Amino acid sequence: MMTSRSIVPQQSTDDVVVVDGKNVAKGRNRQVLGDIGNVVRGNYPKNNEPEKINHRPRTRSQNPTLLVEDNLKKPVVKRNAVPKPKKVAGKPKVVDVIEISSDSDEELGLVAAREKKATKKKATTYTSVLTARSKAACGLEKKQKEKIVDIDSADVENDLAAVEYVEDIYSFYKSVESEWRPRDYMASQPDINEKMRLILVEWLIDVHVRFELNPETFYLTVNILDRFLSVKPVPRKELQLVGLSALLMSAKYEEIWPPQVEDLVDIADHAYSHKQILVMEKTILSTLEWYLTVPTHYVFLARFIKASIADEKMENMVHYLAELGVMHYDTMIMFSPSMVAASAIYAARSSLRQVPIWTSTLKHHTGYSETQLMDCAKLLAYQQWKQQEEGSESSTKGALRKKYSKDERFAVALIPPAKALLTGTESA
């Protein structure tokens, strides 16, 4: 706010200024802040004779012009006065704050009134009570948000677990898994069909068990087999040779002590020679451009089983369903490895009556909801039911059923599938 300045009233043309020389002389020795006595204002008669000045002190009530004279004196006094040091800018004056914030205070008061009104407890009506009871009866009330379990907390000190990067690693696996999926190749294979492929994969499961190989080796073997068949026609008589060479390559890649070529010749009952296996191995590698580092089903199974917090029985059930899905051509073509792995978890939890079937932790780490998994999970449950029906009618068991019917694997192949996945209903 700027300081208001006094406006000097314009002198009338009738005013006469009389200068007293005596007072002027005295003004040279006048003290600071002294009275300026050499200016006298007033109206005089037309004969230019000044009226006699009354030397009695006049008050402001007797002569209002003294107020103007006081205002005239102030600038002169300030001009001759010793300049005061400049004041450092400080807080605004109280008057200014009051004037500026007067409107805002009213606004704050209105806001406070609104907030107070909003915080008032709403009156509970009979209709709202009935609505809440109806929702509770129908199970429509909001469930408390389930907490996501930190499945890597126990592996913080394990450098091989790569806890800092594990989330990024699996995000990368999911982003590239579709690049290495085999396409639908049966139409381009004149001599083989889906049944022949199923027989070959089940035979590879038996060979895998006999050599006591790691699970990674089996899933990589099937991946190499399907990728090769999707780009190169193979005669029926060489189909088993392709499977043997794919197994040899996978074992060299995954195992510390892979089986020898002679062992593969023996297990194939000398149907193929040592040289034929090595030549086919070279043909497959050149066809696939030596690219063997791919995200297989096992890569996702290892992570998803950990997220499921599964015991040994659950883990064997998951592997049984996953291998069952890999055996069937339609499952391999229709669904990605991560989808099959997640669906195997869902179908296994359904068969073993785990509650809840699908948790927030599983949804977070798999990236799939129950709705997304339902088609693949139903297909796995149907294949599980069909294998059990065929096994009960036949005197011999298939390699997969035999493998998972043992007590050391909790005989998970004998556990019936969940009825909910077979009938399509929500209740098991």
Curated annotation (Swiss-Prot):
Cell cycle keyword on record: yes
Family matches, as InterPro entries: Cyclin, Cyclin-like_dom, Cyclin-like_sf, Cyclin_A/B-like, Cyclin_C-dom, Cyclin_N, Cyclins_cyclin-box
Keyword Cell division included in the entry's annotation: yes
UniProt-listed Pfam families: Cyclin_C (PF02984), Cyclin_N (PF00134)
Main location: nucleus
Swiss-Prot/TrEMBL keywords: Cell cycle, Cell division, Cyclin, Nucleus
UniProt GO BP: cell division; mitotic cell cycle phase transition; regulation of cell growth; response to gamma radiation
Record's subcellular location: Nucleus
Tissue expression from the record: Expressed in root tip, lateral root apex, shoot apex, leaf primordia, axillary buds, stamen and petal primordia, ovules and developing embryo.
GO cellular component: nucleus
GO molecular function, one term: cyclin-dependent protein serine/threonine kinase regulator activity
Induction of expression: By auxin and nematode infection in roots. Down-regulated by salt stress in root meristem and shoot apex.
Subunit structure: Interacts with FZR2/CCS52A1, FZR1/CCS52A2 and FZR3/CCS52B.
UniProt record similarity statement: Belongs to the cyclin family. Cyclin AB subfamily.
PANTHER family for the chain: CYCLINS (PTHR10177)
Record protein name field: Cyclin-B1-1
Native source organism of the sequence: Arabidopsis thaliana
